Regions:
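Nucleic acid-processing catalytic cores of prokaryotic defense/repair systems
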Residues: 1-133
């Protein structure tokens, strides 16, 4: 998968944003296999049993947040994660806040700007930012 394909998939994802499938569509946009997504959706690979959370070992921790501050939520989650997730993501579907736990950098954007910030999640596609520079 190349960068232009990722950008194109992100544009489609945002145009037809579905809160129920957002995190799965995001992972698919970066080349995750449909079989992994299927197992994640049905709970086999989801390490979290809390509604609105998706936790995939070494990849991500995702949480829908509506009634609390996104910044406070991501800070609390980042200090408590247990499965070496690379990315912590929280969103209210207006704002997307993500932290790369390996590089210790944060993305804080309007969700509609996700395609412009495609490079943040490139490690999911096997590309580190240093490889692009």
């Amino acid at each position: 998968m190349n960068i232009s394909q990722i950008e194109s998939k992100l544009v489609k994802l945002i145009k037809s944003l579905n809160e129920e499938t957002f995190i799965y569509d995001l992972l698919l946009a970066y080349g995750s296999k449909p079989s992994l997504i299927s197992r994640l959706k049905n709970g086999l690979y989801n390490l979290s049993k809390v509604e609105g959370e998706v936790s995939l070992k070494k990849k991500l921790f995702f949480k829908k947040v509506y009634n609390e501050d996104l910044h406070l939520s991501i800070t609390n989650i980042a200090t408590e994660i247990k499965h070496d997730q690379r990315f912590v993501i929280v969103t209210d579907y207006k704002t997307l806040l993500a932290r790369d736990m390996k590089m210790n950098v944060t993305l804080d954007i309007h969700i509609k700007d996700l395609p412009k910030n495609y490079d943040f999640f490139l490690p999911w596609a096997g590309m580190e930012k240093a490889q692009l520079q």
